[in-house]
Amino acid sequence: MGTWILFACLVGAAFAMPLPPHPGHPGYINFSYENSHSQAINVDRIALVLTPLKWYQSMIRPPYSSYGYEPMGGWLHHQIIPVVSQQHPLTHTLQSHHHIPVVPAQQPRVRQQALMPVPGQQSMTPTQHHQPNLPLPAQQPFQPQPVQPQPHQPMQPQPPVQPMQPLLPQPPLPPMFPLRPLPPILPDLHLEAWPATDKTKQEEVD
């Protein structure tokens, strides 16, 4: 029983020790997520203890990419993490960029089309589509694009348009922390000579 415990400790120590750096080596031993490594441990126990560096190189080199250290393993880092962290936020950002800024800017356009003449609508279509955050007073005289509001007609009756209109014409606010003049710099003062210490003061210090 003691020999099996000693053998298990040796196997664990072989994987726990950091390996010397060499080209193509990531510098970190991680095989807990790989099924092939656990099978190879059972098959090649003796070879693993005798030559851990060579066995590790032959087993680890294919899953790791050439650019270095990956703490969670190659397959876990490249497949699972992008699905969770990148695709869902992209769908939210696409919805926020396309629906929220564009639709409030389209409501005043629909109201103005009945009042203003139509000739300049098609010329300003690209600039209004790509820059939806322009102030509304600049958009009103140009009469942009009658075509785009049709796909978003269910989205048009939104209440956030009314609070946005009074906020845009406000003048820029003064800075929250105004710069104050710095105090005058003190001129360099000459150092006074130290008074000569007599023997009584030296004795007190000692």
UniProtKB/Swiss-Prot annotation:
Q: Which domain of life is it from?
A: Eukaryota
> What residue spans carry the Low complexity bias annotation?
128-142
User: One GO MF term, please?
Assistant: structural constituent of tooth enamel
Task: Give a single Pfam family match.
Answer: Amelogenin
Can you tell me which residues the record assigns to a coiled coil? none
Q: Where is this region: Disordered?
A: 118-180
Annotated GO biological process: enamel mineralization
Q: What is its main location?
A: secreted
Signal peptide span: 1-16
InterPro entries the record matches: Amelogenin
This protein's GO cellular component annotations are: collagen-containing extracellular matrix; extracellular region
Cellular location(s): Secreted, Extracellular space, Extracellular matrix
Q: Which UniProt keywords apply?
A: Biomineralization, Extracellular matrix, Repeat, Secreted, Signal
- Pro residues compositional bias, start-end: 143-180
Q: Which PANTHER family match?
A: AMELOGENIN, Y ISOFORM (PTHR46794:SF6)
Q: Which function does this protein serve?
A: Plays a role in biomineralization. Seems to regulate the formation of crystallites during the secretory stage of tooth enamel development. Thought to play a major role in the structural organization and mineralization of developing enamel.
Family the entry assigns: Belongs to the amelogenin family.
How is this protein named in the record?
Amelogenin, Y isoform
The organism is Homo sapiens
